C-alpha cells in the first residue's frame, strides 16, 4: 500500500500505477482517446569534421507513406557526435509494418548515409511517447494522488519536446503540495499554467494528420500561423482503430 498523502505519479508513458489510477477514478472521462508513438534514438560517434554542433534537423515523410505519421530528428553535439532519432505514430494502417525496419531504411537515405557512414553507434534506445495532446490529457488529480509529466501526457508533439513541460508539472505539483497539502485542485492549477497554454496552441496538429500527410501539413501551417487560435478542437482516435486486418 502507498501511505503517502499526497502521492505524485511520475511513471512516464503507460505507467502501471497510472493506468490503474486513470481507470479506477475515471480520469479520462470526457477526454479524447489517448494516442501513442514509438521512438528510436541512437548516439553516433562520427569521423572528424562532419558535425555542426548546435544544428538541429527534422524530417517528415520517407520512408513512411503519406498515411503514416512520423519523422526524424538529428541533433549535432560536440566531440563529433550526433543523436539520431526516428518516431512513428502507432496509428499506422499496415499490420505488417515495422517501425524499427523503417528506421533502418531511413538511415540508408543518401543524405543520412553520407552523414553516418564510417561512424559508430555508442548507445541506442527506444521508448513510447504520448501524442494525444491536451484534449486527451486525463484529469491530473484524484483523491490522494496527482499525475505529472508523461504519466499525464504533456508532450508538445510538433516539437517532439516534453522535458520542459514535464518539469513544469513537477514544479506545479510541488508548489501545490506545499501550499495546500493535498492533491485536489492540482488539475485546475496546472490547466491555468503557461505549459497548458502551450499545449493548447498545438492541440490540432497531431489529429490533423489523421486525414493524410499533406492535409496534415497544411493544417499544421494554419495552426502555426494563427497560434492555435482556431475555434475548434480536433478529436483524436484510438490507434487500433486505424489498423487494417490481414
State the predicted function of each range.
Residues 31, 94, 136-139, 157-164:
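Alpha-helix capping and helix-loop boundary segments enriched in small/acidic/polar residues
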Residues 1-117, 169-172:
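Predominantly flavin-linked oxidoreductase catalytic cores and closely associated redox partners
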Residues 15-17, 91-93, 134-137, 154-156, ...:
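Flexible loop/turn segments at secondary-structure boundaries
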Residues 153-159, 175-216:
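Active-site-proximal substrate-binding core of FAD-dependent oxidoreductases
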Residues 193-246:
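Ferredoxin-type iron-sulfur electron-transfer modules and their immediate structural context
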Residues 126-157:
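FAD-binding beta-loop-beta segment adjacent to the flavin cofactor pocket
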Residues 141, 147-151, 163-174:
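Extended, hydrophobic alpha-helical segments in both membrane/secreted and soluble proteins
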Amino acid at each position: 500500500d502507498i501511505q503517502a498523502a499526497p502521492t505524485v505519479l511520475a511513471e512516464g508513458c503507460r505507467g502501471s500505477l497510472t493506468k490503474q489510477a486513470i481507470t479506477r477514478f475515471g480520469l479520462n472521462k470526457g477526454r479524447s482517446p489517448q494516442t501513442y508513438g514509438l521512438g528510436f534514438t541512437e548516439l553516433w560517434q562520427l569521423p572528424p569534421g562532419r558535425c555542426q554542433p548546435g544544428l538541429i534537423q527534422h524530417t517528415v515523410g520517407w520512408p513512411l507513406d503519406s498515411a503514416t505519421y512520423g519523422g526524424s530528428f538529428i541533433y549535432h553535439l560536440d566531440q563529433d557526435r550526433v543523436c539520431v532519432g526516428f518516431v512513428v505514430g502507432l496509428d499506422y494502417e499496415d499490420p505488417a509494418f515495422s517501425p524499427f525496419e523503417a528506421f533502418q531504411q531511413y538511415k540508408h537515405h543518401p543524405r543520412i548515409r553520407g552523414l553516418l557512414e564510417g561512424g559508430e553507434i555508442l548507445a541506442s534506445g527506444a521508448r513510447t511517447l504520448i501524442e494525444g495532446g491536451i484534449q486527451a490529457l486525463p484529469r491530473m488529480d484524484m483523491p490522494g494522488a496527482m499525475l505529472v509529466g508523461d504519466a499525464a501526457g504533456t508532450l508538445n508533439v510538433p516539437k517532439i519536446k516534453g522535458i520542459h513541460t514535464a518539469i513544469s508539472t513537477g514544479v506545479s505539483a510541488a508548489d501545490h503540495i506545499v501550499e495546500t497539502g493535498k492533491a485536489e485542485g492540482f488539475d485546475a492549477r496546472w490547466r491555468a499554467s503557461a505549459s497548458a497554454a502551450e499545449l493548447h496552441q498545438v492541440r490540432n496538429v497531431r489529429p490533423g494528420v489523421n486525414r493524410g500527410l499533406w492535409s496534415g501539413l497544411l493544417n499544421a501551417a494554419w495552426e502555426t500561423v494563427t497560434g492555435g487560435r482556431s475555434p475548434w478542437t480536433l478529436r483524436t482516435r484510438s490507434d487500433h482503430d486505424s489498423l487494417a486486418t490481414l
